[in-house]
Amino acid sequence: MTTLTIDAKLFTDALRRVLPHAEKPNSGTPILENVRFTVRGSWLVIQATDRYTVGESRVPLSEVDAAAELDVLADAARVRALVTALRRDALVMLTDDEDEVTLSGAYVTPLDVHRVRDWPAVDRLWPAELGEGVEGPLALNVATLKKLSALPQSTAERRDEVPTFHSVKPGGPVVVLFGEDTRVLAMPGRVNADRARARFGDWHPAA
């Protein structure tokens, strides 16, 4: 049996940054209505995607827990309820008992989770390295901006931090970094640079 013990405050902060990227219930793609938990090195990585964005946040693990092998999914709607119910000063336990995997904490009902299957290969979408910033106009739809707005609100200690935007090539995916432990991959919309400049120029008519 494997049990990971995680600080509830770090855990819930990470989830609040990731949950906006999970697909909504009854979306027609039930696999994306989950949140993924996987151990990578000395981190528990929490991931969600709705095909248009990928959100990841990580929580540090002890040396003992970092040796665990774990890759599971949990229903995003039930994880949201768990986040609301968890006490911030509690510990969260992610337990793999061969027959079942559970996510539990003080004063909350244990949540059954499932081993990963059919999860989209979103890890390969991340670029190997980042550019210096975003070149040219950047178009992000309102839904994506709403998801990104959850980043600085997730924890009071980080409200003075700002997300940074990076791209590998014009028109390609945009990577948004927030602090050291959260990243988002977003697909930009199409933008006509000449039209954008013309629209901006309308605000500054010639004398």
Protein language model features and the residues they cover:
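DNA polymerase processivity clamps
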Residues: 1-207
